[in-house]
Design a protein with these regions (language model features):
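Active-site residues of response regulator receiver
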Residues: 52
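Acidic catalytic/metal-coordinating carboxylates
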Residues: 33, 59-62
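The feature encodes the CheY-like receiver
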Residues: 14, 56
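Short amphipathic alpha-helix used as the core "switch/output" element in two-component signaling
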Residues: 39, 61-71
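Charged docking surfaces used in two-component/phosphorelay signaling
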Residues: 15-23
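Acidic, metal-coordinating helix/loop segments flanking the phosphotransfer/catalytic sites
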Residues: 30-48
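Alpha4 helix (beta4-alpha4-beta5 surface) of REC/receiver domains from two-component response regulators
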Residues: 62, 83-109
Length: 123
């Protein structure tokens, strides 16, 4: 099954997303900040990343640009509590964007679609 890397500075979000995605049959690894992110990509070889935009000390949009420099084809889904980042995420090559919610239906659909189609990053 596909491996998903969840990057979020909130423990409860990482735990909630991890449990829900494991229930869907995915293998899940987590990172709590940008320091861990690139190391986790190299060590765990995820098939997809779910990346929080607003983390303490980090901007997920900047991290996405860093990911794209080295791992251009790795699907990345941005997530935020704010819908205002959607257009900005698309403009810097996110594969999808979701607003954080206790209902993960949208996230699960976008994870499945991104993995099945291996959607390349927009140019």
């Amino acid at each position: 099954m596909a491996k998903i890397l969840i990057v979020d500075d909130e423990d409860n979000i990482r735990l909630f997303y991890s449990e829900e995605l494991r229930d869907e049959g995915y293998e899940v690894v987590t990172a709590e900040d940008g320091y861990e992110l690139i190391d986790k990509i190299r060590s765990d070889s995820p098939d997809l990343i779910i990346l929080d935009i607003k983390m303490t000390g980090y901007n997920g949009l900047d991290l996405l640009q860093e990911i794209r420099r080295e791992f251009y084809d790795l699907p990345v889904i941005l997530c935020s509590a704010y819908s205002s980042y959607k257009d900005e995420g698309k403009s810097i090559s996110a594969n999808a964007y979701v607003v954080k919610s206790s209902d993960l239906t949208d996230l699960k659909k976008k994870v499945k679609r991104s993995l099945e189609e291996n959607i390349p990053a927009p140019e």
